[in-house]
């Protein structure tokens, strides 16, 4: 069986954790999938360091080594690194890439994500809500409806992935007429660590010291 070749576009928080999850389940995935490329605007040394040392999950168990200016190895995996802003310039087709894991947060509509398809990839999985995606998948709710006709696929939001499985079961067993929900979210990279200016005065508060009401894109 020929392995499906995967590229990660955007090696921030989500991109790195997707890669770590892939490494943790290497025995399950190595026969069918290979993460071969990472595209990110940060330099390779910074990305290697951030992958190796994680404040939440700890140091990477696998050995990681830089190979030249544009490659690194993790265990038995060798990854080529690029730094392109425009997916068209990545020429995924020439690289033999089948699936893009779109983790930048920038290409969050089908129109934008299709740039990867125009570049030669076959599928795009967006790690966020995606406007007009062919399919938005939530594991445990509708994952069995995913099919090969879906080209741009959204993995939904963190809130949706938390709420939907619970609501699905409650609605199936008892029925939901209407409802109201709130989400309590850990602070993220766009929340300031100190008090500072923000057009939303609630968001101007230091993340670690305040409970900050805000909206959600879920």
Stretches with model-predicted labels:
Residues 211-218:
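Short, intrinsically disordered, charge-balanced linker/junction segments flanking boundaries
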Residues 2-204:
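N-terminal Rossmann-like NAD(P) cofactor-binding subdomain of oxidoreductases
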